[in-house]
Each structure stands twice: as structure tokens, then as C-alpha cells.
């Protein structure tokens, strides 16, 4: 099976569009506070930031964003991380 990333994921004759985003949640209530689409960041760049296991090469699983990841994401996104108030993660959804 051949995997490719273009505007979607091509699997055989089927194309599944996916969207990656940074989501953040209030620490006090765990309520979703915001989302930012990050589809402009190359998949290889995201892999180097989050180092997924071999079973998740396409970053389908959510990944926590801590200080280290925030610093590496900073050149790519316009978001001020406030770790005292929010938790952050990279998410992937079918679009």
C-alpha cells in the first residue's frame, strides 16, 4: 500500500481529506478554548517535532504540546502559548 500526502491521504482509489490543528483547553474546566489549523506545516516538520511511533507515521493520534514543541512550532504559527492557563495538543481530524 502506498501512502502519500497531498491535499488528502490517498489510499488505493480512495482519498480521505484530513486536517491537523492545534487545540487548546482551559486547565480549570478542560473546556475547549480554541483551535488553529496547521495544515501549512509540512508533515515531515511535524514528525520531527513530535517524533511519532512507527505505527503513527501520519500523525493521526493526538500529541501533547509542551514548552519544547511550542518553541519548535513558533516559526510556523501565530499563537501565544499560555501554559499557566491552557493545555495544548496537536490533533488530526477527517475533513
Say what each PLM segment does.
Residues 7-9, 34, 38, 68, ...:
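Intrinsic disorder/low-complexity signal
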Residues 1-2, 58:
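Short intrinsically disordered, low-complexity coil segments enriched in acidic
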Residues 20-25:
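A short beta-strand micro-motif
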Residues 49-95:
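Acidic, low-complexity intrinsically disordered segments
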Residues 16-18, 86:
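Short, basic and Ser/Thr-rich N-terminal targeting/leader segments
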Residues 31-56:
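Short, flexible N-terminal segments of the mature chain
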Residues 2-15:
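Short, Lys/Arg-enriched N-terminal segments with co-localized hydrophobic residues
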Amino acid at each position: 500500500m502506498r501512502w502519500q500526502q497531498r491535499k488528502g491521504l490517498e489510499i488505493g482509489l480512495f482519498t480521505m481529506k484530513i486536517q491537523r490543528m492545534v487545540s487548546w483547553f482551559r486547565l480549570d474546566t478542560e473546556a475547549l478554548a480554541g483551535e488553529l489549523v496547521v495544515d501549512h506545516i509540512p508533515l515531515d516538520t511535524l514528525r520531527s517535532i513530535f517524533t511519532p511511533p512507527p505505527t503513527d507515521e501520519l500523525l493521526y493520534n493526538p500529541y501533547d504540546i509542551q514548552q519544547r514543541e511550542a518553541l519548535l512550532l513558533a516559526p510556523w504559527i501565530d499563537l501565544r502559548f499560555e501554559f499557566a492557563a491552557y493545555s495544548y495538543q496537536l490533533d488530526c481530524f477527517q475533513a
